[in-house]
UniProtKB/Swiss-Prot annotation:
Principal subcellular localisation of the protein: cytoplasm
InterPro entries: MobA-like_NTP_Trfase, Molybde_CF_guanTrfase, Nucleotide-diphossugar_trans
Organism: Shewanella woodyi (strain ATCC 51908 / MS32)
Subunit structure: Monomer.
Residues the record lists as binding Mg(2+): D99
Name the record gives this protein: Molybdenum cofactor guanylyltransferase
Coiled-coil segments on the chain, per record: none
Pfam families the record matches: NTP_transf_3
Gene encoding the protein: mobA
Swiss-Prot/TrEMBL cofactor(s): Mg(2+)
Length: 196
């Protein structure tokens, strides 16, 4: 029996460091940043969903289901994950941000292998130096635990990981895979690096 893996792209933040511009819709090399993330993960999953709390019609134009956080108030990435976990029938949910245009093409394969080999509930990606807290593969059945954590006033996702059997999947062979864009300057640097 093959496993079903769906994905959610988190585009629900306020993007304060990008001058309030919706990061997923900021153009990078002539297309919205979120399209780069879609291109990288589409071959790896069955369904893609987009979590966005504004500009929903523009995201819907990309042809994927779009939903906002169940809890209003921009409570961070956990709120988007909780909503996505309630919308999928998949065995696993891949979570990625909208501003990582170089995600590994073997992201799901390596994270799933690590989960299965260690009997874990979730895997978080690492570039070899730092964990990437919003690049993870997890079982949607963890939704109640995550919701209780958020409802208890917690926001730090790594504190939630610590409550579960979480494994780190290292991608040190792809050191640029998790470069993200938080400022206009970073966007320019990344565009120049990709163009080389």
């Amino acid at each position: 029996m093959s496993l079903r893996i769906d994905a959610v792209i988190l585009a629900g933040g306020m993007a304060r460091r990008m001058g309030g511009n919706d990061k997923g819709l900021v153009e990078l090399l002539d297309k919205p940043m979120i399209e780069h993330s879609i291109d990288r993960i589409k071959p790896q999953v069955k369904e893609i969903m987009i979590n966005a709390n504004r500009n929903q019609s523009r995201y819907a134009d990309l042809g994927y289901p779009v939903f906002s956080d169940e809890d209003s108030g921009y409570l961070g990435p956990l709120a988007g994950m909780i909503t996505a976990m309630g919308q999928t029938q998949a065995d696993y949910l891949l979570v990625v941000p909208c501003d990582c245009p170089l995600l590994p093409l073997d992201l799901v394969e390596r994270m799933l292998t690590k989960i299965q080999s260690e009997g874990a509930e979730l895997a978080v990606a690492s570039d070899g130096k730092r964990e990437q807290p919003v690049v993870l593969l997890l079982k949607p059945s963890l939704r109640d635990s995550m919701k209780a954590f958020l409802d208890g006033g917690e926001r730090k996702i790594d504190f939630w990981y610590a409550k579960h059997h979480c494994v780190v999947t290292e991608f040190s062979d792809q050191p640029n895979a998790f470069i993200n864009v938080n400022t206009p300057e970073q966007k320019q640097q990344l565009a120049e690096a990709i163009a080389k």
